[in-house]
A protein has these predicted regions:
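Electron-transfer interface patches adjacent to heme c in soluble/periplasmic c-type cytochromes
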Residues: 29-30, 34, 92-208
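Bilobed periplasmic-binding protein/Venus flytrap-like ligand-binding cleft at the lobe interface
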Residues: 71, 143-148, 212-219
């Protein structure tokens, strides 16, 4: 106890001494904060990547990217997550076919080309990170988007219907998609000039609904391909 009191007396003496040297104390504190801040802020500028891409993961095609834009615009992220957490019950639910082997949860490398990522935080509807492995056809997805209450076995579903996405009045804006691809290339997504040149033919006469279906069928597909190659 005596030793502790002695320490407090010493500390109090030091504090009193610095109280009389406010300018110097402020200067030293500022220097310490700046040095600490530099150690925190400078290293990230030299990091080209923080996650190693999964070898089978490829950038979205023009049609899939258009569908992703529609997904964001319609607010799907407000009700669906895109990240399977590393819990057994969650993996069992969202990887029923065991397409991802023993580790069926989401990996960082699956999202390297997502700008922004669409993990979400609310599951009013199911997680969609591995939707491609639910083995649902394009026709199933189309009918589900047109009327969620007649497809999927949930007659009281609160999911909105999106029939207009498949109408001719909602054709894909080709120029906008190509512009988006070029912007993504500028931040590191490996699109090529060939991708830009082929986009108009891939998107010709396609509706936003068709694009959204293509996007849903892409989710989790590439990372599942890696597991197939390991079998």
């Amino acid at each position: 106890m005596f030793g502790f009191n002695k320490f407090l007396d010493w500390f109090s003496e030091i504090a009193d001494r610095w109280d009389t040297k406010g300018v110097k104390f402020t200067l030293y504190t500022t220097i310490a904060v700046v040095i600490g801040g530099l150690f925190e802020l400078i290293p990230p500028f030299f990091l080209t990547k923080t996650v190693t891409p999964i070898s089978t993961v490829k950038p979205y095609s023009a049609l899939e990217l258009a569908g992703r834009d529609t997904y964001q615009r319609e607010g799907c992220i407000g009700c669906h997550t895109q990240m399977v957490r590393p819990f057994k019950w969650e993996v069992d639910r969202f990887d029923p076919t065991k397409a991802y082997g023993r580790t069926g949860y989401s990996k960082g490398g699956e999202y390297v080309y997502d700008h922004p990522f669409l993990w979400g935080s609310k599951r009013t509807g199911p997680d969609l990170a591995h939707e491609s492995q639910m083995l649902r056809s394009d026709e199933w997805h189309k009918n589900h988007l047109i009327n969620p209450r007649t497809v999927g076995g949930v007659p009281n579903s609160i999911m909105p219907a999106y029939p207009w996405l498949f109408e001719d009045s909602h054709k894909i804006d080709v120029e906008q998609v190509v512009s988006n691809m070029k912007a993504l290339k500028a931040i590191g997504v490996p699109y090529t000039e060939e991708d830009f040149a082929n986009a108009p033919s891939l998107l010709k006469d396609k509706t936003e609904g068709q694009a959204l279906v293509a996007y849903l069928q892409k989710l989790g597909k590439d990372s599942a391909e890696l597991q197939k190659g390991m079998k």
